């Protein structure tokens, strides 16, 4: 079967009510990938959901602080997942495209946790985006969210100071910008 890659624009949808649905899924998981020596390789690897045999590939470039991206993930993505991804029609890849320093830190966090936590954590952070993005101290709020995923304060601080990880995410962003000029 011929595979096709499709880039979908992220479009604004109605405002959402932040929920803690993703938080419950995160509470039960341990942060084992945070302690591994190959954190950088793990964190910069592709994040995909859906069948390897899906005939359509979708790559979404998103920013953790983008309101439109949050709207898409809170309002539209559940429908895309149930109708296209879960049915084996689409394989969906999420690619980081941080628009600011806070988004860069949030991307570093979600990419540093074990892969099984990635999608639930992205879901939680985007659902609760107004809480942490608009806070007086957004990094502290992000750290509170990280605790729900079992990320200790030391692990969180290590992720935030991991220059190769942060630079790797910026490189992924730049590659996306260069590839889709």
Where are these regions (language model features)?
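N-terminal secretory signal peptides
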Residues: 1-12, 22-31
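C-terminal cap of thioredoxin/glutaredoxin-like
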Residues: 2, 6-8, 36, 63, ...
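A short beta-strand-turn-helix
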Residues: 40-56
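Short active-site neighborhood of thiol/selenol oxidoreductases, capturing the structured segment around
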Residues: 53-67
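Structural alpha/beta surface segment adjacent to cysteine/selenocysteine redox centers
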Residues: 62-64, 70-147, 152
């Amino acid at each position: 079967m011929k595979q096709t890659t499709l880039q979908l624009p992220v479009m604004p949808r109605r405002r959402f009510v932040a929920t803690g649905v993703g938080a419950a899924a995160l509470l039960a998981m341990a942060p084992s990938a945070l302690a591994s020596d190959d954190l950088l390789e793990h964190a910069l690897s592709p994040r995909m959901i859906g069948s390897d045999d899906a005939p359509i590939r979708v790559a979404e470039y998103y920013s953790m602080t983008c309101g439109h991206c949050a709207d898409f993930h809170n309002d539209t993505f559940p429908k895309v997942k149930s109708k296209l991804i879960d049915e084996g029609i689409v394989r969906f890849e999420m690619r980081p495209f941080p628009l600011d320093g806070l988004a860069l830190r949030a991307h570093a966090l979600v990419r540093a946790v074990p892969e099984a936590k990635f999608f639930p954590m992205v879901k939680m952070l985007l659902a609760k985006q107004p809480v942490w993005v608009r806070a007086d101290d957004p990094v502290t709020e992000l750290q509170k969210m990280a605790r729900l995923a079992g990320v200790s304060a030391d692990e969180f601080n290590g992720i935030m100071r991991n220059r190769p990880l942060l630079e790797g995410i910026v490189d992924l962003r730049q590659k996306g910008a260069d590839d889709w000029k």
